[in-house]
Each structure stands twice: as structure tokens, then as C-alpha cells.
């Protein structure tokens, strides 16, 4: 289900082409990405403000990943269950997925946040997650494309 928030209420929009679970991604009301785990292969879709379109799969299948995107042509999908939990990070450029600098700590079920006004595939935060069955973490990592490095912000 896709819904849009206008500041006071939600409006239902067009649904994803393929229903799934563990959706990661981000974007705006007019341009977004999502990656769904739970099924093989992962289903990736691009939002143009009106409808979802299927796009290519990541290079490495992962379930329960984190994600960050500022549009449907700039995003990251990171970590997740390969299985086991993994550090793999891939960037979307609007056409293809490319493996980039991986996270420092393998995890699944983490949340993602786009960093700054031009986030997506240039900066992101990976927050929390599960590092082993039943073992959760509050670890936050920052991904910055200019440095091609991962920085540990906090540990738990």
C-alpha cells in the first residue's frame, strides 16, 4: 500500500506492483525507491509520483535491509540477511546497482535515514538492527560517498 501525507491526513495512492515484506528505501512524494525482501529475488521498484515501476535487482540478494533514497535515481540499500547478516551496501544510480563501501557491522532489520538535502547515494545513516538472532544493537553508522568510508557514531 502506498499513501501520501499532506500535513493533516493520509491519501491512498497506487500500490506496489509486487506485494512484499521488509520494505526499505526512501524518497519524496514525487520520486522514490523501495526494495522488498522476504521473497527471492528481492523486488525493487521506482516511484514517479503516480505509480511504481519494477527496476533491476541488486547484485546480492538480501532480506530485511536498510535503505535510504532522496529520489528514484539516487539511493542505497545496505546490510540485511543474505543469510547470515551482512555488511553489503549497494548504490542505485537510476539504471544499475553498484556495490560500494560496506557497513562496519553486519546487521538486519535496521532503519535508514537520508543525510542532508542531497542524501540518497551520497550520504545516509544506518540505525540499529539485529546482529544475530535475538541480539539487537543501537549502533548508528554514517555512510558518506565523498569519503567512501563508514564512520561509527555510537555503539551499544
What are these regions (language model features)?
Residues 1-156:
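Polar, enzyme-active/binding microenvironments
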Amino acid at each position: 500500500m502506498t499513501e501520501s501525507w499532506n500535513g493533516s491526513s493520509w491519501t491512498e495512492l497506487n500500490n506496489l506492483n509486487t506485494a512484499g515484506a521488509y520494505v526499505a528505501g526512501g524518497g519524496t512524494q514525487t520520486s522514490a525507491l523501495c526494495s522488498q525482501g522476504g521473497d527471492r529475488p528481492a523486488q525493487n521498484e521506482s516511484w514517479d509520483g503516480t505509480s511504481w515501476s519494477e527496476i533491476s535487482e541488486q547484485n546480492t540478494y538480501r532480506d530485511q535491509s536498510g535503505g535510504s533514497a532522496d529520489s528514484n535515481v539516487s539511493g542505497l540499500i545496505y546490510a540485511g540477511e543474505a543469510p547470515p547478516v551482512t555488511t553489503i551496501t549497494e548504490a542505485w544510480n537510476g539504471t544499475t546497482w553498484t556495490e560500494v563501501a560496506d557497513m562496519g557491522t553486519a546487521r538486519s532489520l535496521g532503519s535508514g535515514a537520508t543525510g542532508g538535502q542531497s542524501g540518497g547515494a551520497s550520504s545516509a545513516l544506518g540505525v540499529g538492527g539485529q546482529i544475530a538472532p535475538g541480539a539487537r544493537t543501537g549502533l548508528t553508522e554514517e555512510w558518506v560517498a565523498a569519503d567512501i568510508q563508514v564512520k561509527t557514531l555510537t555503539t551499544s
